[in-house]
């Protein structure tokens, strides 16, 4: 007696719902994660057991490398653009629109304003070397009655730049923004001399900027 052959039907699974879930999860993680900024000079901050968190938006990061050189960056391009324009005016220097874009692309300021034209004439490799070996001047500028340093001028320019951007927002747009002003973070390398950190803090206090956070990395409590 012959065997009855059962016809096999092709199995078809609709993967559309699974794809939707994957896209949703990917979007969630992209929105919730804090991406590391592409900075020329990076530091390894000292460990700390504090649980206070540092803001990831509307921040002015002041970086102090192991040799005490000071650099500056912010998370908002528009803040950097406005601050750069103000600093060029303060230091009586000029850059073309394309040159300004080149400076902003670095996402970190680490050279004197008047050195920027010469800085931009060099190769990218030489530019990176200069950024790593120069820093923003913290000495008082000559011919200024207020005796402010270029570092102090940058801090004020950054804060003013963010304030201008915020004030230009509509009332509806302001409800979407969590910070009304720029928050200052100080990131010093664990090998940075204390005197260099003390100098930066003194420079901030001289311009009435006494609210700031010292950035550290999490460290477990020793049992």
Question: Which residues make up each language-model segment?
Answer:
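Short hydrophobic/aromatic-rich motifs at helix boundaries and adjacent loops
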Residues: 1-4, 13-14, 56, 172-174
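Hydrophobic single transmembrane helices highlighted by the model
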Residues: 3-40
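Long, low-hydrophobicity, acidic/polar, solvent-exposed interaction domains
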Residues: 36-223
């Amino acid at each position: 007696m012959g065997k009855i052959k059962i016809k096999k039907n092709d199995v078809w699974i609709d993967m559309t719902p699974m794809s939707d879930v994957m896209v949703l999860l990917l979007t969630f993680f992209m929105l919730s994660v804090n991406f590391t900024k592409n900075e020329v000079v990076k530091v390894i901050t000292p460990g700390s057991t504090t649980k206070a968190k540092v803001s990831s938006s509307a921040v002015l990061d002041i970086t102090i490398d192991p040799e005490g050189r000071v650099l500056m960056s912010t998370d908002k391009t528009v803040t950097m653009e406005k601050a750069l324009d103000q600093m060029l005016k303060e230091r009586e220097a000029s850059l073309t629109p394309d040159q300004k874009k080149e400076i902003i692309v670095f996402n970190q300021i680490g050279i004197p304003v008047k050195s920027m034209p010469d800085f931009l004439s060099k190769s990218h490799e030489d530019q990176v070397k200069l950024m790593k070996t120069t820093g923003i001047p913290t000495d008082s500028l000559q011919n200024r009655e207020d005796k402010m340093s270029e570092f102090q001028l940058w801090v004020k320019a950054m804060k003013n730049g963010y304030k201008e951007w915020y004030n230009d927002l509509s009332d509806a747009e302001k409800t979407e923004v969590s910070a009304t002003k720029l928050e200052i973070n100080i990131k010093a390398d664990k090998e940075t001399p204390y005197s260099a950190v003390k100098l930066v803090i003194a420079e901030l206090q001289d311009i009435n900027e006494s609210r700031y956070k010292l950035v550290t990395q999490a460290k477990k409590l020793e049992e």
